[in-house]
Amino acid sequence: MTIRRTLPGLAVGALVMSLSLALSAGPATTAIAEARVPAAPTVSEQQVMPHLRALQRIADRNGGNRAHGTKGYAQSVAYVKSALDRAGFRTRLVPFIHDGATGNNLIADWPGGDPDHVLLTGAHLDSVKEGPGINDNGSGSAAVLATALQVAESGLKPERHLRFAWWGAEEQGLIGSQSYVSKLSGADRRRIDVYLNFDQAGSRNTRQWLVVHDDEHGETEAQQAFEAWFAERSIPTFDIGVGGSDHESFGNAVIPSSGFSTGISDCIHEACDNLANVDPKTETTSTDAIVGVLWKLAATAPRH
């Protein structure tokens, strides 16, 4: 993942965003938009970390990993799917084949919202064979799952359609997400307003959140929303390009994307990427950011 600084500082970034928003919408429009946004719930550590503990247990009983083509990955998919099914999501498995093994992407749709304007939020669920992948990327998967469950618990009625995804075989080269995107029709691609990707959301020693900047589409509303969310809490951010994770699959298909990462933790792609490799506070903050921004984007009337 190539990191580059696109703004000299948070203060300037916040000022630029404020000026941009002021120019793009009049006072009345802004007031209406703000009035429509329901208050986002706050997520606790107890609503996120149990999912990571579950993924650790799955790895422990399956040779220490949750890699593509293994029982560990299949059980990880089953765990997430079961939680979503109980919450009222419409779930489906989308199979693909890589290196002679069948894998599944898990797709979950929340009923309602404009099907011509989809907010797609995702993370890869697989690990490398060398370790359990609890930060890379159990942390992103758990944050997305906790967000989806908050949608259900709150009974959110979004303006846009909400879809969540957990990708397989990312560690082999973005295979699952590439397979999914390649099978979308042109019309289905255009229905996705933005794809939000989260890879490594709980890294230890995190000092700043790395927010995805989409060079193809410029500063998306999602990027603006994430940077504003963090700025309001005096949390530093750093712009990164689209690449190195599943948002690249969408970028290659000219689908707008954003999201964030907390960078590489103390251990990556080894057996030490276990539960101890995740900082619960960072993981919870990441999940709160996803919830807060998703609530904002979901309540925004689609631009026709």
Language model regions located:
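A non-catalytic alpha/beta surface segment that caps or lines the substrate-entry region
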Residues: 53, 57-111
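Metal-dependent peptidase/peptidase-like ectodomains
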Residues: 167-265
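Secretory targeting and sorting signals
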Residues: 1-33
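His/Asp/Glu-rich mid-to-C-terminal helical/loop segments that flank catalytic regions of hydrolases
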Residues: 266-304
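Second-shell loop/turn segments in exported
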Residues: 36-43, 61-72, 90, 95-97, ...
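Alpha-helical metal-binding/catalytic segments enriched in His/Glu/Asp
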Residues: 121, 125-174, 290
